[in-house]
């Protein structure tokens, strides 16, 4: 299977085989944010920053034999089981788990993986509410634009306080 860079045009003949994104040499930032802080109707702390890790690298997959462009199913499965090498990263903002206040309903906790286009950040001086600004609703979008981060993957989950 040939490797493909994100956003590339792919010939019809190549689309018949499984395609794997090429991330060789790239670094990434992972951010966890809560856009519903303190609640979906009160955005006074939104967005609330829960975690930032910079300088992450993706684990390479075994490219098969030197004279083959084929990958074994085991190589592909192993590469996607733990694709991020967390040992390569720098924890810019320590992890803070979910903690929605009582009677605020469901909160979305969103993980976003960004490709870094500039050198990795090494310092964050802001507070967690509003990503360190005094602007309600300020969060990951403005932070990413300011620091040259391009979103490449996202996932989220819901959590709520047990005392509703």
Each model region followed by its residue ranges:
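N-terminus-centered regions that define maturation/targeting leaders and the start
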Residues: 1-164
